[in-house]
Swiss-Prot record:
GO terms for biological process: prolyl-tRNA aminoacylation. This is Proline--tRNA ligase. One of its GO terms (cellular component) is cytosol. The keyword Protein biosynthesis applies. GO terms for molecular function: ATP binding; proline-tRNA ligase activity. NCBIfam families: PRK12325.1, proS_fam_II. Its main location: cytoplasm. HAMAP family: Pro_tRNA_synth_type2. It comes from Bradyrhizobium diazoefficiens (strain JCM 10833 / BCRC 13528 / IAM 13628 / NBRC 14792 / USDA 110).
Length: 439
């Protein structure tokens, strides 16, 4: 992609409305534009990152055995009345009526609808276990939306829903999602810590939030520092095996949100030197809620003895759009964003340091074409901006690798390769730069 043809409305000044780093950098880098309180348009740069995050989430859900579908954003109010949540959910739910006076709502979550889909088709335990997920926009009418995409009213979310015959089988599904979430966030360059948490309006008696530590986080957390060093399961993890040892390894080390924090246990179990009381950002939450929805909505299956029983359910959410903010909070410096390679909008940017110089232009074009031919996702800054402005823009938008080509280095047949994550620089031939990025 040539920058001269890319829509990248970079802001020179820090937006006054931005309270935290991620909001400020997303606005400055031309990733989003606020259209209303808590509602954002996703501009090309931000949308590229959003789609990469979404794809990682999708791949790990598929790997765990979950099946993707897509449910609508609008839901019938009657479904929520069946579950008893229509009046209980509160003013965060956007309630609307169509021209025929039918009551609808803009879904803040999908437990009711997925249960309705399940009960329409699944009648026997032989069709279990089943885990269905979708990635869809949701709306919650936050009283005070703030912090950009971290606490918006409209947001993109992955929510999965498991259906099992009994509690033991439902715990197996819960464990699969627990491991899938560990892998999902690790692939994005994040250390997300699972912590016991309140179940809130979703309900149930078991829940874990996945928290990324950050001073700007809204959640107070208490952890044993040992949890920071626990290994994340690799790509070869067998989801059909017993995952209990992995779950025990992660849950046996103290980690809790402030809502369920046990101060006495924390002091008793955790040596003082390993205690950490800080703040964090919730990027995902998983729930086991048993028969909370299946009983009132009569989602039943015939068991092995032929008797109908309510299914045991779980739900599993990831804040896909919120993850952009969380990643930036964890990966930035004073100059801008430092994207982990897996989610970066581009892997590399070619910086033409003297636009109009025939030799430099030709070298940039050649390198740009070679990288594209090798499958490298590359941005070519072919604008007529001065070199300093190009450096600043490249640092701001956070592309992992910068390839700088100017007349001085080119006279020696060299280009400069900069790694954004640590600022390290190397001088090498264009061919070596291509090999480094392809390898």
């Amino acid at each position: 992609m040539r920058l001269s043809r890319f829509f990248l409305p970079i802001l020179k000044e820090n937006p006054k409305e931005a309270e935290i780093v991620s909001h400020r950098l997303m606005l400055r880098a031309g990733m989003i534009r606020q259209e209303a309180a808590g509602i954002y348009a996703w501009l090309p740069l931000g949308f590229r990152v959003l789609k990469k995050i979404e794809q990682i989430v999708r791949e790990e859900q598929d790997r765990s055995g979950a099946l993707e579908l897509l449910m609508p954003t609008l839901q019938l109010a009657d479904l929520w009345r069946e579950s008893g949540r229509y009046d209980a959910y509160g003013p965060e739910m956007l309630r609307i009526a169509d021209r025929h006076k039918r009551e609808l709502l803009y879904g803040p979550t999908n437990e009711e609808m997925i249960t309705e889909i399940f009960r329409a088709y699944v009648k026997s335990y032989k069709n279990l276990p089943l885990n269905l997920y979708h990635i869809q926009w949701k709306f919650r009418d936050e009283q005070r939306p703030r912090f950009g995409v971290m606490r918006g009213r409209e947001f993109l979310m992955k929510d999965a829903y498991s259906f099992d015959l009994n509690e033991a089988a439902a715990r197996v599904a819960y464990n699969k999602m627990f491991v899938a979430y560990l892998r999902t966030f690790a692939r994005m360059g994040l250390k997300a810590i699972p912590m016991r948490a309140e179940t809130g309006p979703i309900g149930g008696d078991l829940s874990h939030e996945f928290i990324v530590l950050a001073e700007t986080g809204e959640s107070g957390v208490f952890i044993n520092r040992d949890v920071l060093d626990l290994p994340v399961p690799g790509e070869d993890v067998d989801y059909e095996s017993d995952l209990t040892p992995i779950i025990k390894q992660w849950t046996s080390v103290y980690a809790a949100t402030e809502d369920v924090h046990d101060a006495a246990r924390f002091e008793q179990e955790v040596p003082e030197a390993k205690r950490l009381n800080t703040r964090g950002i919730e990027v995902g939450q998983i729930f086991y809620f048993g028969t909370k929805y299946s009983e009132p909505m009569k989602a039943m299956v015939a068991g092995p003895d032929g008797v109908d029983v309510p299914i045991h359910g779980g739900s599993y959410g990831v804040g896909v759009s919120r993850l952009l903010g969380a990643i930036i909070e964890a990966c930035h410096d004073d100059a801008g964003i430092k994207w982990p390679e897996a989610v970066a909008p581009f892997r590399a940017v070619v910086l033409n340091l003297k636009q109009g110089d025939a030799a430099v232009d030709a070298a940039c074009e050649k390198l740009y074409a070679e990288l594209q031919a090798k499958g490298v996702d590359v941005l070519y800054d072919d604008t007529d901006q001065r070199a300093g402005a190009k450096f600043a823009a490249a640092d701001l938008i956070g592309i992992p690798w910068q390839i700088m080509i100017g007349p001085k280095g080119l006279a020696d047949g060299k280009v400069e390769l900069k790694r954004r994550s640590d600022g390290s620089r190397e001088t090498m031939s264009p061919a070596d730069a291509v090999a480094r990025l392809v390898g």
